[in-house]
Every structure is written in structure tokens, then in C-alpha cells.
Amino acid sequence: MAPRRARGCRTLGLPALLLLLLLRPPATRGITCPPPMSVEHADIWVKSYSLYSRERYICNSGFKRKAGTSSLTECVLNKATNVAHWTTPSLKCIRDPALVHQRPAPPSTVTTAGVTPQPESLSPSGKEPAASSPSSNNTAATTAAIVPGSQLMPSKSPSTGTTEISSHESSHGTPSQTTAKNWELTASASHQPPGVYPQGHSDTTVAISTSTVLLCGLSAVSLLACYLKSRQTPPLASVEMEAMEALPVTWGTSSRDEDLENCSHHL
């Protein structure tokens, strides 16, 4: 009877042992992998650090995966040390040959030689603007004509070079009297930052103010000369009037003397 009871206990204990083994929590629960290793010219976005999770590396922009290499890595457990780690990927990222051939070439500098801009004339009929000065390879001419009764009319080219200003004045009251003054100003302003005026701008203002002062001075001198002439004219007129008044008196006295002589002869 005793051996039969022992065999029955063993038969009942085996399923219970299997059940306990199945219900026992696994030893690997809660184990996670550290951050994966870095690969040159590639990035990785890890979605899960748990065991047996798989992730893939992605090559950066301008690079592509080399043929024969793999971007796959997996979180595995080292049973000897009971430590989880990522498998080493064989990925190698190389430059994309298609993008290398499509790289744009640097812009080349083109220099145009012997170009002389033609200034446009907006002056009234009968007035000739000043001629533009010759330009070199890297400089251009800026011509401005100042005509009495009109505004400043500049003719500008892409780069600042020589500036010429001519002022022509004509007098309609007196015949053939023309006063012309020319100023030539040279200013080297090849590269001027925006918002900064070149040196020729201030020189032009000085030249215009100088011409205005000279014209005012000439006008004052002419007015003074006319005033002096007008003051000298009345005395001459008075002398002529006195001479004219003296002539009849002399003629009257001479005729009286002749009459007296004739009367004396008759007597």
C-alpha cells in the first residue's frame, strides 16, 4: 500500500510543479538596454529600450547606406553577465554620388570692358547739357546739367565715377552776354555702403553755392554801376540846359547892338 501512495503523490506533484514554473515571473522582466552606440554620419530614434526590440539607423542628408551593410540593431541579453545591450550594426554611410554631381558651381565673375553709358538729356529745347566724361573698365560717368529755370537732371550709371557740372546762363536784356562756369570734380567712390552719400555729393553742393554767390556779386556790381551812371547824368543835363538858355540871351544882345549902330549911322 505504501509504494502505491508514493507513486500517487509523485503523479499529482508533477503538474503542480509545472504550473508553478509557468506562473513564476521571468527573470528578464524589467531589463532594458542602454542608449545605442553612435554611427558616423547616421542617426537613430529609439522607440523602445526593452529586450528583443529592433531599431534602424538612418543616414544623414547627403549620405546613403553602403551596399552590403545593415542598419538594423537589436536589444539582446548577455546570459553570462545578465546585462542587456544593442548589437553592433555593420552600417556605413557614404556620400551620395548623385548629389555630388549635382552640386552647383560657384558663381563666376564676368567683367565687361569698354562700355560707355549714354546719358539721357531732359533739358528744355535750346539748352545743351554737359557732355559725359569717358569711363574706364570699372568706372562710369555721372553727368548733371544745371540750366536756369530748370531742376537738376542727373544721369547715373551702375558705378560712381567722374562728375561734371556745367552751368549755362544767358541774359535776354543785354545782347551777347553769356556767363558760363564749369567745375570738374573727381571722386573715387567705387564701393559705397547703402545710405552713405559719395564725396561728389558734398562737392556738388559747394559748387552750386559758389556759383550762386558769384552771380549775386555780379548782379550787385551791375546795379551799383547803373546807380552811379544815373547819378552822373543829371548834372550833364543841367549844364546843357544852361548853355541853351544862354544862347538866346547872347543873340538878343548882339541884335540890339547892331540896331543901335545902324541908327547912329543914319543920324
Curated annotation (Swiss-Prot):
User: Which tissues carry this protein?
Assistant: Expressed in neutrophils (at protein level). Expressed in fetal brain with higher expression in the hippocampus and cerebellum than in cortex and thalamus. Higher levels of soluble sIL-15RA form in comparison with membrane-bound forms is present in all brain structures. Isoforms 1, 3, 4, 5, 6, 7, 8 and 9: Widely expressed.
**InterPro entries from the xrefs?**
IL15RA (IPR042372), Sushi/SCR/CCP_sf (IPR035976), Sushi_SCR_CCP_dom (IPR000436)
Query: Membrane as a keyword?
Result: yes
GO terms, molecular function: cytokine receptor activity; interleukin-15 receptor activity; protein kinase binding
Q: Where is this region: Disordered?
A: 102-178
Q: Which domain of life is it from?
A: Eukaryota
Q: Which residues cross the membrane?
A: 206-228
Q: Where is the composition biased (Low complexity)?
A: 129-145
Q: How is the polypeptide modified once translated? A: N-glycosylated and O-glycosylated. A soluble form (sIL-15RA) arises from proteolytic shedding of the membrane-anchored receptor. It also binds IL-15 and thus interferes with IL-15 binding to the membrane receptor.
Compartment(s) where it occurs, according to its Swiss-Prot or TrEMBL record:
Membrane; Nucleus membrane; Cell surface
**Which residues lie toward the Extracellular compartment?**
31-205
How this chain sits in the membrane, per its record, is: Single-pass type I membrane protein
What are the record keywords, sorted? Cytoplasmic vesicle, Disulfide bond, Endoplasmic reticulum, Glycoprotein, Golgi apparatus, Membrane, Nucleus, Phosphoprotein, Receptor, Secreted, Signal, Sushi, Transmembrane, Transmembrane helix
Residues listed as glycosylation sites in the UniProt record: 137
Question: So what does this one do?
Answer: High-affinity receptor for interleukin-15. Can signal both in cis and trans where IL15R from one subset of cells presents IL15 to neighboring IL2RG-expressing cells. In neutrophils, binds and activates kinase SYK in response to IL15 stimulation. In neutrophils, required for IL15-induced phagocytosis in a SYK-dependent manner. Expression of different isoforms may alter or interfere with signal transduction.
- Subunit comment: The interleukin-15 receptor IL15R is a heterotrimer of IL15RA, IL2RB and IL2RG. IL15RA also self-associates. Interacts with SYK.
Q: What is this protein called?
A: Interleukin-15 receptor subunit alpha
